[in-house]
């Protein structure tokens, strides 16, 4: 299965809630100026996630089948990047250490 590009993934999530690895629900508010705008459950903006970080996560997921939910792998907003990645069909959170994985196809 081919993974989407970061901008396509993010645009498809606008207005939708996504869950982080620890179960926190956040909402994707929009995509602007190369970033995904993420809001907390009270409606306030809590992060601007670089589309480049989302794309890097997608690329690593495609190449290696998994990516760690960590700053070094997904950038400063790794938790939110991972929450977006698991919205792709066939992708889920894994345990110990926290990671995002593609299912075998």
Please give the residue ranges for each predicted region.
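Long, low-complexity, charged/polar intrinsically disordered regions in eukaryotic proteins
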Residues: 1-47
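Short amphipathic alpha-helical segments that mediate assembly, nucleic-acid/protein binding
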Residues: 5-6, 54, 78
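Surface-exposed polar/charged interaction patches
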Residues: 15-16, 60, 64, 88
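Generic beta-strand structural signal
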Residues: 30-31, 93-95
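Short acidic, hydrophobic short linear motifs in intrinsically disordered regions
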Residues: 48-73
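Short amphipathic alpha-helical interaction segments
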Residues: 71-87, 93-94
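Short, cationic-aromatic polyanion-contact patches
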Residues: 96-105
């Amino acid at each position: 299965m081919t993974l989407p590009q970061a901008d396509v993934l993010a645009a498809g999530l606008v207005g939708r809630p996504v869950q982080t690895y620890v179960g926190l629900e956040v909402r994707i508010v929009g995509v602007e100026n190369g970033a995904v705008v993420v809001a907390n459950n009270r409606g306030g903006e809590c992060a601007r996630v670089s589309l480049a970080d989302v794309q890097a996560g997608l690329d690593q997921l495609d190449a290696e089948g998994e990516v760690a939910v960590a700053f070094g792998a997904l950038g400063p907003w790794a938790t939110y990047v991972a929450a977006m990645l698991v919205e792709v069909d066939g992708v889920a959170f894994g345990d110990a250490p926290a990671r995002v994985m593609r299912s075998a196809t």
